[in-house]
């Protein structure tokens, strides 16, 4: 058994084992609650999160309204209810142990609204927001307004530099860390620039090293890089 050293994540010292967001409803309040209960970090997927009726049954979200905009509004309202419901479940399981994060795909329609309203509706129950599938420029502003840490997902140092210069430099207090998702090894939402050849994969270690150097140069040496997207361990590289 490896003795992992605790680090500070989202304002609390925890074991640095972090549940992946898993896309569409792949992680929920139950899974994330148990991660946090053991002193780690759980991550609830906000994409199609379930909510329940008065009998505890999952509500199968359907809109019977006729206009497209109205149906869209109903689906967004359901997503917000689901995120809040799952955050409450996670908190009930975890108590005050670990940390509870949520994960959202930035390019989904009205993702800003979903994140904002879930954080408001589950005030104090969610400690961090992870977000990728695009460049989430407004994530720092949204999370900071609610006193919640944020964790952008990037695939290169250049991507983070763009986010930092355009927005995050103004919201550095609640930048909890950066998630690195490798553009060749990850399962989806991969970010390659036009200068990079998709058929010539680069060593992820060098890309992570460059990202670390960039964070250090920006005065963010204490911010952790969370490795995701199929990059398994340093010993592989």
Feature annotation, model-predicted:
Residues 234-237:
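Short, intrinsically disordered, charge-balanced linker/junction segments flanking boundaries
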Residues 1-221:
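Active-site entrance/lid segments in N-terminal catalytic domains of soluble metabolic enzymes
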Residues 223-232:
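Glycine-rich beta-strand-to-loop/alpha-helix junction loops that act as flexible
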């Amino acid at each position: 058994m490896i003795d992992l050293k605790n680090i500070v994540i989202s304002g609390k010292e925890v074991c640095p084992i972090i549940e992946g967001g898993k896309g569409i409803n792949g992680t929920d309040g139950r899974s994330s609650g148990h991660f946090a209960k053991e002193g780690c970090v759980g991550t609830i997927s906000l994409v199609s999160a379930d909510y329940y009726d008065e009998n505890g049954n999952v509500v199968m979200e359907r809109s019977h309204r006729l206009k497209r905009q109205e149906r869209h509004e109903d689906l967004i309202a359901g997503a917000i209810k689901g995120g809040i419901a799952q955050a409450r479940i996670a908190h009930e399981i975890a108590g005050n142990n670990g940390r509870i994060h949520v994960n959202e795909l930035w390019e989904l329609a009205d993702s800003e609204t979903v994140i904002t309203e879930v954080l408001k509706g589950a005030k104090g129950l969610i400690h961090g927001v992870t977000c990728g599938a695009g460049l989430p420029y407004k994530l720092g502003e949204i999370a900071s307004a609610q006193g919640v840490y944020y964790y952008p997902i990037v695939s290169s140092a250049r991507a983070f530099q763009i986010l930092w210069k355009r927005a995050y430099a103004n919201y550095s207090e609640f930048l909890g860390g950066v998630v690195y998702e490798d553009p060749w090894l990850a399962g989806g939402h991969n970010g390659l620039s036009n200068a990079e050849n998709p058929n010539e994969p680069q060593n992820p270690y060098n890309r992570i090293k460059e990202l670390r150097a960039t964070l250090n140069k920006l005065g963010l040496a204490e911010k952790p890089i969370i490795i995701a997207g199929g990059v398994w361990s340093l010993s592989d590289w």
